[in-house]
């Protein structure tokens, strides 16, 4: 059985929501909710938070989680994941779990990680969910993905893909969780930045344009993510409905 490491990148200096990982949802911080829900995964061998901020690091340690300090110079979350992967050499699959999804379902993590484990020929795995609301399909901030018959990504775009010109075909929204083959992850930054990546502002297109396979795990629903204080209020109401926090 391959050893699988889950990594939750957590930055304090978010431009739209400074201090976001430490925002309170009930009596717990958002990073604690994310960590505790991710730890319910049945396939992760280890779970760590990767942060460049000592405040986040100390909060994670205080609630009993594992945290590692990383450089503050990383231009992306992927670079932070690479630094952590270099510190944990015994893991062959690395799962990048978004720190701003406090209600993440363990089944999503299990699905993405297991898909990567069962397809060593693919460099990466990620997830998608059926896109049923057309207004969301044309939303530039919601990334769409086209999937081939073998469950592999053909292309990711912020635009509406595929076109609904002649017939209505299923639409899928990409979810920001990734399972990486360790060897591929460590060489990722040596791949040249692609024109597609620059055009769409989507890192995963670097792998696509270089000819690497990305498997897609189809999830039934997308969880709520927090980008702004307004998003946090939506999550708080959702947690109340779930009876995870009190009214």
From Swiss-Prot:
A GO term from the CC aspect: cytosol
Coiled coil: none
Enzyme Commission designation: 2.7.7.38
Biological processes annotated in GO: CMP-keto-3-deoxy-D-manno-octulosonic acid biosynthetic process; lipopolysaccharide biosynthetic process
Swiss-Prot/TrEMBL catalytic activity: 3-deoxy-alpha-D-manno-oct-2-ulosonate + CTP = CMP-3-deoxy-beta-D-manno-octulosonate + diphosphate
Subcellular location: Cytoplasm
Highest rank taxon of the organism: Bacteria
UniProt entry keywords in alphabetical sequence: Cytoplasm, Lipopolysaccharide biosynthesis, Nucleotidyltransferase, Transferase
InterPro entries linked to this entry: Cytidylyl_trans, KdsB, Nucleotide-diphossugar_trans
A GO molecular function held by the record: 3-deoxy-manno-octulosonate cytidylyltransferase activity
Annotated pathway: Nucleotide-sugar biosynthesis; CMP-3-deoxy-D-manno-octulosonate biosynthesis; CMP-3-deoxy-D-manno-octulosonate from 3-deoxy-D-manno-octulosonate and CTP: step 1/1; Bacterial outer membrane biogenesis; lipopolysaccharide biosynthesis
Entry similarity comment: Belongs to the KdsB family.
Function, in words: Activates KDO (a required 8-carbon sugar) for incorporation into bacterial lipopolysaccharide in Gram-negative bacteria.
Name of the protein in its database record: 3-deoxy-manno-octulosonate cytidylyltransferase
Species per Swiss-Prot/TrEMBL record: Leptospira interrogans serogroup Icterohaemorrhagiae serovar Lai (strain 56601)
């Amino acid at each position: 059985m391959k050893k699988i490491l889950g990594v939750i990148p957590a930055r304090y200096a978010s431009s739209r929501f400074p201090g976001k990982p430490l925002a309170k949802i009930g009596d717990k911080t958002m990073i604690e909710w994310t960590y505790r829900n991710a730890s319910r995964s049945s396939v992760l061998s280890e779970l760590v938070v990767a942060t460049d901020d000592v405040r986040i690091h100390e909060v994670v340690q205080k609630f009993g989680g594992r945290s590692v300090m990383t450089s503050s110079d990383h231009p992306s979350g992927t670079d932070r994941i690479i630094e952590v992967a270099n510190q944990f050499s015994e893991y062959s699959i690395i799962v990048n779990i978004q720190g701003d999804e406090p209600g993440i379902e363990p089944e999503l993590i299990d699905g993405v990680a297991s898909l990567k484990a069962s397809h060593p020929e693919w460099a990466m795995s990620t997830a998608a969910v059926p896109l049923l609301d057309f207004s969301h399909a044309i939303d530039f901030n919601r990334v769409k993905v086209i999937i081939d018959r073998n469950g592999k990504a053909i292309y990711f775009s912020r635009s509406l893909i595929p076109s609904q010109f002649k017939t209505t075909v299923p639409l899928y929204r990409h979810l920001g969780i990734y399972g990486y083959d360790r060897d591929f992850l460590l060489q990722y930054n040596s791949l040249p930045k692609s024109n597609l990546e620059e055009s769409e502002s989507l890192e995963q297109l670097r792998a696509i344009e270089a000819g690497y396979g990305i498997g897609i795990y189809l999830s039934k629903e997308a969880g709520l993510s927090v980008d702004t204080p307004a998003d946090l209020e939506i999550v708080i109401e959702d947690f109340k409905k779930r009876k995870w926090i009190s009214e």
